[in-house]
Amino acid sequence: MSTDRYEIDRGKDFGHLEHAPIVEAVIEIKCPPQVPWNEDTIPDEVGKLLSGYQLLDSRSEYSQTVNFEDNVPIPESMEKVGWKGVRYRSEDESYIAAFNRDGFVFSRVGRYETWEKFSAEASRVWKVHRSLARPSDVHRIGLRFINRIRLPGSGIDLDDFIYPGPQPPKNLGFPIVSFLHKDTFAVPGNPYLINIIRTSSPSPSAGGDVDYAIILDIDVYLQETFEVDDLKIEGHLEDMRILKNEVFWGSIPRPLLENLRGDSG
């Protein structure tokens, strides 16, 4: 296992996948506000500054008290501990932005287009959060892409759709009904960590047809504190995008990649 510094090539061109299986893309910036984060004022302030979006919901945080009786947990009560934040959704329902007490979350749901469009809109909306919250420090940045790869049916070789594919124990040739696998990787010489989850969704039921798919969930993140700096944040996100692409392209067998590429080449 090499521990040499991994050079992240920001200029690397991965090409375009016309049929990319992305179902959600998320940017998260953990940065506590330096001003009061009040339910009475923040939702309206966001609405005034954020064009092209409408209020989706307002969310609170709760704690649950659990008692034990004969070593069996018994939930007792839910208590509101504070207001978490507000979510706004774009008028075309393709973006959701969360303005939270602990930071900012921006999601693309549905059909993904390009990184340039996604990151540009995230940057625009992030500036609204920054202007209201006035954070001084960033504690975590995350970039997460969730892919759903549909399978044509049962009785297929999963190695044709995901690498590495799930395997039974060496001494047992049992068929795989469902699987869940998680890895966390460090990037040598860089401050990033990568969580990779490969799982089946939904699990097939005995005797019934199901829409069977593989979920490839890639989460690249940086967990260290630095002063808020938009150029620095953009640089980290660009590094994370490259790492995310490296993981995706290294997880999908070439014949499937060609199918996902489509006619655009």
Language-model features, listed with the residues they occupy:
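N-terminal low-complexity, intrinsically disordered segments
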Residues: 1-99, 232
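Glycine-rich, often proline-containing surface loops adjacent to acidic residues and nearby aromatics
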Residues: 21-28, 95-112, 138-146, 210-222
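Aromatic/basic-lined ligand-recognition segments
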Residues: 12-14, 78-92, 96, 107, ...
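Hydrophobic alpha-helical segments and helix pairs
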Residues: 87-130
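Short glycine-rich, low-complexity/disordered patches
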Residues: 56-70, 131-149, 176-178, 246-265
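Short, charged/polar micro-motifs that form catalytic or ligand-binding hotspots
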Residues: 17, 32, 36, 105-116, ...
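Long, compositionally biased interface segments
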Residues: 211-265
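Extended intrinsically disordered, low-complexity coil regions enriched in Ser, Thr, Gly, Ala
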Residues: 37-48, 113-136, 226, 230, ...
